Amino acid sequence: MSEGSLGDKDSRSGEQLGRRDAGHDTRSSGSSAHAAGPDPASSAGQDDTYALYRRGLDLLGKGSAAAAAQLLARASAAEPESRSILEALGRAQFDTRHYEAAAGSFRRIVDASPSDDYAQFGLGLALARTGDPGAAAEHLALAAAMRPNLRHYTDALRSVRATLSARNRLREETPE
């Protein structure tokens, strides 16, 4: 698996994002549409949005992140508060190296749910890739504090902190 790709949650390490159980959908009064399927009372638009989301996840799982990002962007436009859709969109954007966009998607989740460790992790990785290791370290530290047993969280934090340390040493050694 390449360093910039999204893999399965259980197989990711270092600077990779991956799938997790998506119990964060906010479409139907707090219940997860993933477990129960589409609500029979939902409109055709919501059914279409759910189909876009499921197809986007399928494409993402098969390594077609660019196609997934297109579908997931449409789903997100229809359901802008859905954290499940935003997470999948952020993963697709990260995999297609659209790190600013990925950071934006993960930031929306973090703003709505600061205790979402995976969103903190995704935001941290995306910020690291945009060249902001200071902000990245903050979010990765939060993720690692929330889930210290997840090695890829602590590995990513260690990597970003090493980058910050190296930059600080260079600044100290470089005469102005």
Can you name each region flagged by the protein language model?
Residues M1-A51, E176:
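Long, contiguous interaction/recruitment modules in multidomain scaffold/adaptor proteins
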Residues S42-A78, D95:
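Alpha-helical segment of the N-proximal tetratricopeptide repeat
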Residues K62-A73, T96-R108, T130-L142, L164-P175:
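Structural signature of tandem alpha-helical TPR/SEL1-like repeats
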